[in-house]
Amino acid sequence: MNPHVIITNMKKRYTGVSGTINALMPVQASDLEIGFIGEDLPGAQLAKAQHPENFHYLSVWQAIALSRKKLPNGRCRIWHVRRDPEMMLTIFLRDVLRFPIKLVFTSAAKHRHSWFPRWLISRMDGVIATTPEAASFVPNTTKVVFHGASLDRFTPPENKSTAWQRTGLPGKLGIGLFGRIRPTKGTDIFVDAMIKVLPDFPDFTAIITGQALAAEDNYKHAMDEKIRTAGLADRIVFLGNLAADQIPLWYQNVAIMVACPRYEPFGITPLEAMASGCAVVASRTGAFEYIVQPGQTGELVPTSDVDALAIAVKKLMSDTSTIEQMGRAGRARVTAEFSIEKEAQGIADVYRTVLQA
């Protein structure tokens, strides 16, 4: 066992960063010997099952012990980190303990970092930005690499209407919002838009996935009250936190996927939905303006604009053939431009650049 790259996931809660790592590991392990430390992920288990010779679970102490020496070929080992505490650890190993390692960081934030994260990022050997905007806030960006979606994990069903029927929920087609339940994700914007639209479209039912933490109890309760008052409790349904293996099924179940956050660094859910054959309506934040092609794979609306979201959704609901066409076009776009394999290749390019420096 001598992994060339050590990938860290040192956060207990499953986040968007966790989702990215989860999707990448089985692909990266097909070409690289990887050591993985931190909270376990389904993607790590899959990588271990598919590539047992290339994928290794490590404790932090095992990873540190391995990193005291260079690889047998004389090259430095790479640590790929994505969070501030992970940068702090690896900078200490390299600069204080003088370990022969190279550090790569992925930055998605679309704002100027505070002074301490800026200093941490400045100490990296390589920086991957997930969008050109993210790169504009990180002077030492090595390469822009867009996130990708797994075309194997996220696949379209044969028929969206048939897929919806298996849910047991009312109506003939579904519209969904995926991710955490909180104000920044725009859950309330989605609920308000659905209250405007659903009474005119009895064939549609809305679902909302994701966890509401204790801090969002009042926020969730206010939405529940709005939904009950509107008489739509059976047609705007909170599914709660889904198991990882259930998420692809629910993308298959819905015909339209909405992503309406007030702010998003990148936002992977539209890619997963498009790979699953959904038409997508998204707000103009994150990487959505790069991903969604208005009129072809979905529609884009201003952030925090309930009326604009309602109009865009109503436009799609009025023409199911357009939904189907957009779903096919979305799958084709992810295949051509935003596959997880393309992301993995971009990351591998950065690893090579860092090792050659």
For each predicted feature, which ranges?
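A short, well-ordered alpha-helix in the C-terminal region of glycosyltransferases
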Residues: 315, 322-337, 343-346
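Conserved acidic donor-binding segment of nucleotide-sugar-dependent glycosyltransferases
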Residues: 294-295, 299-307, 315-321
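Nucleotide-activated donor-binding/catalytic signature segment of Leloir-type glycosyltransferases, i.e.
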Residues: 220-241
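Short alpha-helical donor nucleotide-sugar binding micro-motif in glycosyltransferases
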Residues: 241-242, 249-254
